[in-house]
């Protein structure tokens, strides 16, 4: 089996048969099931959410995470090949899967409690639940040091106030991982559920790029969450930065995917 598309540097020789098979599986899914429907969604600025469970069935959500954490337990190389093929279909598709796996499933797997893992990871890995990552705000990019969103401790609860901007999957999400600074200026991660009082989202329309990706603003006004919603095993900037490191691996594949799109 060989790498699909141009292989000027004989990269196929560096890949395992499993990795090549996984790439072909992703390639066939994009070519046969995704490309026929993407044009309409691109024009309308919508995402075909009905494919989420198919992505889960194929193991494309959090692929490199262990199976007990909702992933497929494949190599990081295989995960990269999956994202490469999803990007070939559309940037919105790659972004959807990358956020779900690298920015939502990964931090729950790495920093969450056992209860949080049991509650969220199976559904997220299956594509039955959708997640988003709330870091960027309107006055700064993905720079956690400039964060204005706050988390104030009140007994066994936290009160979250602030907003997040340019959030992929925002209005689609059943759970949002929102990063906020506590009263000591320590960055902490909280799992906010759709429908919580004071928690809302508003989609951003008229984009020139990533049109098939749902991008939203998240608003938190005195949102009360129990302490059990806080990621217990991480605090400080390492939390969001480690998630971004996971996601940037997928972003690097864009530069390969675009020129190979015709293949």
Model features per residue range: what roles?
Residues 142-143, 158:
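Hydrophobic, small-residue-rich alpha-helical packing segments that form membrane-like cores
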């Amino acid at each position: 089996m060989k790498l699909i598309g141009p292989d000027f540097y004989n990269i196929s020789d560096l890949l395992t048969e499993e990795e090549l098979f996984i790439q072909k599986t992703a390639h066939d899914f994009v070519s046969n099931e995704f490309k026929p429907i993407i044009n309409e969604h691109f024009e309308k600025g919508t995402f075909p959410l009905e494919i989420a469970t198919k992505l889960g069935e194929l193991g494309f959500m959090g692929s490199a995470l262990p199976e007990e954490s909702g992933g497929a337990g494949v190599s990081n190389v295989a995960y990269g090949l999956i994202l490469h093929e999803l990007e070939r279909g559309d940037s919105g598709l790659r972004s959807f899967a990358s956020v779900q796996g690298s920015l939502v499933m990964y931090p729950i797997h790495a920093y969450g409690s056992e209860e949080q893992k049991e509650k969220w990871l199976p559904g997220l890995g299956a594509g039955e639940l959708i997640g988003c990552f709330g870091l960027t705000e309107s006055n700064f990019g993905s720079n956690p040091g400039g964060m204005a969103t706050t988390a104030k401790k009140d007994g066994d609860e936290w009160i979250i106030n602030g907003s997040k901007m340019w959030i992929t999957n925002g209005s689609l999400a059943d759970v949002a991982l929102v990063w906020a600074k506590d009263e000591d200026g320590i960055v902490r991660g909280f799992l906010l559920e759709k429908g919580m009082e004071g928690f809302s989202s508003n989609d951003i329309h008229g984009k020139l790029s990533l049109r098939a990706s749902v991008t939203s603003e998240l608003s938190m006004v005195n949102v009360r969450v129990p302490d059990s919603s806080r990621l217990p095993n991480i605090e400080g900037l390492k939390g969001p930065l480690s998630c971004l490191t996971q996601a940037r691996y997928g972003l690097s594949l864009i530069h390969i995917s675009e020129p190979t799109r015709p293949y």
